[in-house]
């Protein structure tokens, strides 16, 4: 999996086990600029990123400018995106990673010295 910030896209590659060669299998258009990708045990992907790229650049230059954060859970088969978190940057500016744990989702940022610990429903 490769996140592409400027085109707001996630590329999915198939890997040949014998050679290690990668072949593009699909591109998934997103509504935000994706940063890091976390693979869940069930094959779904948690992707964190930046809904407003120009605001993110302003945040890079001035940390007092809040930058929105977004996290989605992508299911590949069938393809489906579920927004997990969206914030204008008041709780956490410039989300860069979302790590699912049992009963929790940890969301980290590019520059913050803290992360969010969000409780999630337990699925049985």
Predicted stretch roles:
Residues 94-124:
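Blade-level signature of beta-propeller repeat domains, shared across WD40, Kelch, NHL, RCC1
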Residues 3, 9-31, 76-89:
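Blade-edge beta-strand/turn elements of extracellular beta-propeller
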Residues 1-2, 46-48, 107-108:
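Residue position within the beta-strands of beta-propeller blades
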